[in-house]
Amino acid sequence: FLPAVIRVAANVLPTVFCAISKKC
């Protein structure tokens, strides 16, 4: 369960950070 959550977070966080900081 945990590794899957980490994998999802690793995929989602860069996208969220990109959207917030407008640095893509």
Swiss-Prot record:
Provide the Gene Ontology terms for cellular component: extracellular region
Keywords on record: Amphibian defense peptide, Antibiotic, Antimicrobial, Cytolysis, Disulfide bond, Fungicide, Hemolysis, Secreted
Q: Give the main location.
A: secreted
- Among the Pfam families in the record, one is Antimicrobial_1
Q: Which cysteines are joined by disulfide bonds?
A: 18-24
Can you say where in the cell this protein is located? Answer: Secreted
- Any single GO BP term: defense response to fungus
Name the organs or tissues of expression: Expressed by the skin glands.
User: What family does the Swiss-Prot or TrEMBL record give for this protein?
Assistant: Belongs to the frog skin active peptide (FSAP) family. Brevinin subfamily.
Protein task: Has antibacterial activity against E.coli and S.aureus strains. Has antifungal activity against C.albicans. Has hemolytic activity against rabbit erythrocytes.
Query: What is the designated name of this protein?
Result: Brevinin-1JDa
UniProt source species: Odorrana jingdongensis
